[in-house]
Amino acid sequence: HNSASVLTPAGATPWKGAMSKDISVTLNTEGVYVYECTPHKMMAMVGVIKVGSATNLDKIKQNSQNYKRAFVMNKDRLDKYLSEL
């Protein structure tokens, strides 16, 4: 597994961790971040982080529509996570 950012607030620094290695990320830009396990993207192995206010939530939801096309399992997982913000 790894952790890699896929959708971030404007101006945020993206990250991509190496396979099977720990990663530490400092998030300094307010908003919603979506990250994935790159080799397991098709299974919707994703997560969501909210830093401060969800100032970019509408943009993330819009951009996630195209991103989710790669999911073959758990197709509603990201929508569920975003709905909890």
Residue ranges of each PLM-predicted region?
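Extracytoplasmic copper-binding redox domains, predominantly the cupredoxin/blue-copper superfamily
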Residues: H1-L85
